[in-house]
Amino acid sequence: MFLHLMKALLKGGGVVNGYQVWLESFYNSIKGKAMRLYIIGNGFDIRHGLPTRYKHFKSYVAKNDKELYDAIEEYIPAGDEWNELESALGEIDYELILQNSEMFLVTYNTEDWSDAYHHDYQYEVDKITRMLSARLKEQFADWVKGINIADAYNSEQYIPPIPRESLYFSFNYTNTLQQIYAVPDAQIMHIHGNCSYDEDLILGHSFRVEKSLNPYIGPDQDIRIAEAYDSIDKYFGNTFKPSEDIIKEENVFFSSLKNVDEVIVLGHSLAEVDGEYFSEINKSIQKVLDG
């Protein structure tokens, strides 16, 4: 993310102090000019001819991991846009997962009972939920890293002017701004990660689960069913996008927005799943406007 990049750019005084020094120098260099913040979404890359739609990712998964593709099709009711996928991760049909796995829930008094039956049901539920969380994210990261930014050079859809003397808040994982418009890394906040750096890329929903989805917790519940619900709960935790924590981690960047005069949105739908970021941006800028 942002301070991750600054570690490579700044020496001495600590990363945060170094970034604050850099900001002061940056603001002095553009004194008298309008200070803009560009919010960049996937539509920006799409306009440059890059295959970054959700349907392109699904095609990649269909080719490289058919089992995962089938699970996505069955349990995640997403449309064609990224914000729909992220929202759908929080609307996974977990009841269908439990229902489809019931063939492994063998009754205890069956004649051919095996000790393996103690674990088969919850194992199947856990396998599906892990596939739709960890494995999906692994395939996603591999796909993003394989996107060829050079394809954007051939695009007739450049968006002039993209001034370098601005700050950029990007939801994209690609380096289109850097490679096509020569915007320095230090002026770009890749809020969900950058595919060029060895870090986790963030993909998730905004549905915070406050308590277990298990409706019948108690000593009389079949332990296999209880453990299956544990896997469901873990899924929602593992696919949750911790926007609040990310904002705290990147507080230096958000504090820097106090000098912004204008916000320009390019290629983002302002979807609810990213609402916390927009609220924080608005709050950071509003502090100045309110005096």
Where in this protein do the model-derived segments appear?
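Active-site periphery "cap/insert" segments of enzyme catalytic domains
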Residues: H56, V61-G193, D198, F254-S256, ...
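Short aromatic-enriched loop/helix-cap "lid" or pocket-rim segments at secondary-structure transitions
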Residues: L50-T52, A182, L203
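Short, charged, surface-exposed secondary-structure boundary motifs
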Residues: S196-S206
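N-terminal ordered "arm"
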Residues: R36-Y69
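SIR2/sirtuin-family catalytic core signature
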Residues: L5, G12-G13, W22, F26-H48, ...
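Acidic, metal/cofactor-coordinating or nucleic-acid-engaging core segments within structured domains
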Residues: L213-L257
